[in-house]
């Protein structure tokens, strides 16, 4: 993924609390080692009918043509709870999501997301509720809701309304400069090499 400064996209509402990683991508798909093509398994058990796999559940929001090409997911508290599985982040990214906005996230999922440069935005419950209401109004009027997330200003903008969010400087740096832990470490490669060269012989 490229560096993230600002993104404008269609908002998709997933009005469910405590969505765990098994909901995001079920365990049977964890044997897949490639990050590509995981998007088709995103929310698999909700997205497809139980007794006829791969038959879309027309009542699930991801199958609503109205939200096709959505890139900003709006959801509720404790998103990404449950077991640690990086596949959950990979599936969200491969589907096309660039930003997830919720009132809280599970800690390990939060770290995995930023390591893969998926931006997570935390807003208050009341602010999340306001956004859901805004989406409902737009949908009722047959208008898609576009949201702009500006990481330089730490803002979420919906028309004339702005919400401000906080983010750790380290994670913000990852996103703005397209870094991960490996690329960040490689910035200090010369220092690491110098340290290794100065090690006593018995440590080499």
UniProtKB/Swiss-Prot annotation:
Keywords: Amino-acid biosynthesis, Branched-chain amino acid biosynthesis, Leucine biosynthesis, Lyase. Belongs to the LeuD family. LeuD type 1 subfamily. Heterodimer of LeuC and LeuD. It is an enzyme of class 4 (lyase). This is 3-isopropylmalate dehydratase small subunit. Transmembrane segments: none annotated. Its EC number is 4.2.1.33. GO terms for molecular function: 3-isopropylmalate dehydratase activity. Catalyzes the isomerization between 2-isopropylmalate and 3-isopropylmalate, via the formation of 2-isopropylmaleate. It holds the Pfam family Aconitase_C. Pathway: Amino-acid biosynthesis; L-leucine biosynthesis; L-leucine from 3-methyl-2-oxobutanoate: step 2/4. One of its GO terms (cellular component) is 3-isopropylmalate dehydratase complex. It comes from the Bacteria.
